[in-house]
Amino acid sequence: MSKFENVSVIKKANVYFDGKVSSRTVLLGSGEAKTLGFMQPGEFVFDTNQKECMELLAGQWDILLPGESEWKTFNAGESFNVDANVSFKVKVSDFADYCCSYTD
């Protein structure tokens, strides 16, 4: 889905890692929340509170999922899922434009 309709957007940005990662929360009419974000170059560790689907819209990133020992490269159009209450690592060499969907 390249477009969300009939949504509310929380204006205040979620800013992490000294401004190298930022996102905005989008609330769909169904009550579902998503974040649209952007990452600058760096290595980051994220903790999840609920299941997430991370979709890369543009750019590239390397992901180290929980329990894995090898990084996996993702390109634009690819996604991965992460369970609730885990940590995962992200390495960005150029930039990453992403959409995070939260699921139960």
Swiss-Prot record:
- Classification via Gene3D superfamilies: Jelly Rolls (2.60.120.10)
An example Gene Ontology molecular-function term: guanosine phosphorylase activity
Query: What are its E.C. numbers?
Result: 2.4.2.1, 2.4.2.2
Name the reaction it catalyses. a purine D-ribonucleoside + phosphate = a purine nucleobase + alpha-D-ribose 1-phosphate; adenosine + phosphate = alpha-D-ribose 1-phosphate + adenine; cytidine + phosphate = cytosine + alpha-D-ribose 1-phosphate; guanosine + phosphate = alpha-D-ribose 1-phosphate + guanine
What is the top-level taxon of the source organism? Bacteria
Kindly report, in one word, the top-level EC class recorded for this enzyme: transferase
In its keyword annotation, does this UniProt entry include Cell division? no
- Which InterPro entries does this UniProt record tie to the protein? Ppnp, RmlC-like_jellyroll, RmlC_Cupin_sf
Q: Which GO terms describe its cellular component?
A: cytosol
Q: Name one Pfam family in it.
A: Ppnp
Q: Which UniProt keywords apply?
A: Glycosyltransferase, Transferase
Output the PANTHER family linked to this UniProt entry.
PYRIMIDINE/PURINE NUCLEOSIDE PHOSPHORYLASE (PTHR36540), PYRIMIDINE_PURINE NUCLEOSIDE PHOSPHORYLASE (PTHR36540:SF1)
Family the entry assigns? Belongs to the nucleoside phosphorylase PpnP family.
What does the function comment of this entry state? Catalyzes the phosphorolysis of diverse nucleosides, yielding D-ribose 1-phosphate and the respective free bases. Can use uridine, adenosine, guanosine, cytidine, thymidine, inosine and xanthosine as substrates. Also catalyzes the reverse reactions.
- Name of the protein described by the UniProt record: Pyrimidine/purine nucleoside phosphorylase
- Source organism: Pseudoalteromonas translucida (strain TAC 125)
